[in-house]
Structures are given as C-alpha cells and as structure tokens.
Amino acid sequence: MNKKDIATPTRTRALLDKYQFDFKKSLGQNFLIDVNIIQKIIDASNIDERTGVIEVGPGMGSLTEQLAKHAKKVVAFEIDQRLIPVLEDTLSDYDNVTVINEDILKADVVEAVQTHLSDCDKIMVVANLPYYITTPILLNLMSKSLPIDGYVVMMQKEVGERLNAEIGTKAYGSLSIVAQYYTETSKVLTVPKTVFMPPPNVDSIVVKLMKRQAPIVAVDDEDQFFKMTKAAFSQRRKTIANNYQSLFFDGKQKKYIIKTWLEDGGIDPRRRGETLSIKEFANLFNNLKKFPELEF
C-alpha cells in the first residue's frame, strides 16, 4: 500500500471535496481511512489470483482497490448512485472490478455471480457492511444457493459478537444459530470508531465466517427451523415453553402438548432459549412430526 491509497484521511477528504459528496446517515455511510485495517482484512480473507470477491457497499473504493490487487475479479454492489462516478474514477486502473448500482437485497446476486465470477476457483464476500442492514444482508446471502466459500466482513461490534456468541451468553440468540448452522465463525479483530470518516457511534468488529461443507445439523425445512429458533428468543426472560405458546396456533390452549413435545425431546420446559444448543433445537424441530397438533 502507498500514499495514493484511498484509505487515508487526506485522499478521502480530497475525494469528498472533488465530488462535493455529503454522507447519508440513512445509508450508514462511514468510510474506512486506515490502510492497516484494510490489510488485515485482506490477509484474513486469504484471497489470491484465483478468487472471486463480492463486496457490499464499496463507498469510494478504499477496500475495493486492495481487493482488486489481490483477487481475480471483484463484483461490488453499491446502492448510492452518487458514488458511481467516484468509483469509476478511483478504480479506473482495475479492469477486474465490476460495480453494480443496486441494492444487494434486491439484486439478482445469483445471476451476477454466474455472469462475472463463474471462472473463479472460490468466492469470498469481503466487505465493510452497512450497519443498518448487516443482518438482512448476511441472512440473504447465506440462505441463497450461492457458491460462496466464506465471508470476512466488518460490522457493528454488537452484531459481530452475536454471530460468534457461545451458548448461555447474553449475545447468544437466533442470529448465532443461523451463523453456526451455515458457517464456522471466528473473530478477526476489533476496529475503533476513530478509523472511519465520519466516525460511527460504536466500535466495529471484523468477523470471518467459513461455509461448512454441510450444515451442522440436518433439518428438512430451514426457513421453518429458523422461525422456530427465533421464537425461542422472542422474550429472553421467559421460559422456552412460554415463548412457544406464542409460536403455535392456539398455543395457550396447547400448553400440555408443548410441554410433552419439549420433554419428549429431552428439554426441560423451564429452560430458556439461550441455554439450548443448535443440536437441541434441531432435535426439537425434527420431533415436531410426532406432534401434528403443533402448527406454526
């Protein structure tokens, strides 16, 4: 990296002035201005000349330019039309970058991968995710039939800790279950808010999620499974039996059946959702077949 890199206060301010760019809080725009942090993200992603990269929210291209130097191809989704001419400028030296001016949650990511990254040996998502939609983005990408091998993503520290949380902790919840289901998760580093322009209100964290060859547990309907696990955390102070009364149709009239279903799965109805492992949740879900009265 050198003095011309985008991820410096001087270069970022110069670009802001050149394009008279104003940050939009509604889009969670906070541009990274520390080349050392970017290098650590690159190192953690293990990308090389055979790797295709999906980036979400490239901003002015501070991370994108470094991805382009190391990866075979980069596809970056940017929702803000105002940043497209900026990116055309900052990334003009790289013919292996495709910028798509679309909302990642509405874009046809499958088609984009087939069109631009089909000749890559592996695909990684490497991004400084917009904080306001971090969870929807991850859930959306994980649940699609995409050949993504892993993710190295920066996000709000609180959300990152939920992804990597252990059973029984305050951070452990439905998002922890989804992440654990699809990936092996680890923390890369904590990032202070001072290395962004403008600085966000909270510190950030970089998390690495590597896709499992197969989900850690077997369930026949992932959407319903995640709906069931989410309900277990709907009111964290309540027991799992009480939370599930709100999930099932006529649940309050089926207290005894819910209790029997839980006990049949080896779960004490007085336990709270945060004490159950993903394997225990999967066992409960698969055990629902024996209790046709319990529908949701």
From Swiss-Prot:
Its EC number is 2.1.1.182. It comes from Staphylococcus carnosus (strain TM300). InterPro entries: KsgA/Erm (IPR001737), rRNA_Ade_diMease-like_C (IPR023165), rRNA_Ade_Mease_Trfase_CS (IPR020596), rRNA_Ade_methylase_Trfase_N (IPR020598), rRNA_adenine_dimethylase (IPR011530), SAM-dependent_MTases_sf (IPR029063). It catalyses: adenosine(1518)/adenosine(1519) in 16S rRNA + 4 S-adenosyl-L-methionine = N(6)-dimethyladenosine(1518)/N(6)-dimethyladenosine(1519) in 16S rRNA + 4 S-adenosyl-L-homocysteine + 4 H(+). It is an enzyme of class 2 (transferase). Signal peptide: none annotated. It is found in: Cytoplasm. Keywords: Cytoplasm, Methyltransferase, RNA-binding, rRNA processing, S-adenosyl-L-methionine, Transferase. Its main location: cytoplasm. Gene3D superfamilies: Ribosomal RNA adenine dimethylase-like, domain 2 (1.10.8.100), Vaccinia Virus protein VP39 (3.40.50.150). NCBIfam families: ksgA. Belongs to the class I-like SAM-binding methyltransferase superfamily. rRNA adenine N(6)-methyltransferase family. RsmA subfamily. PROSITE patterns: RRNA_A_DIMETH, SAM_RNA_A_N6_MT. One of its GO terms (cellular component) is cytosol. Specifically dimethylates two adjacent adenosines (A1518 and A1519) in the loop of a conserved hairpin near the 3'-end of 16S rRNA in the 30S particle. May play a critical role in biogenesis of 30S subunits. One of its GO terms (molecular function) is 16S rRNA (adenine(1518)-N(6)/adenine(1519)-N(6))-dimethyltransferase activity. This is Ribosomal RNA small subunit methyltransferase A. The keyword Secreted does not apply. S-adenosyl-L-methionine binds at residues 30, 32, 57, 78, 103, 128.
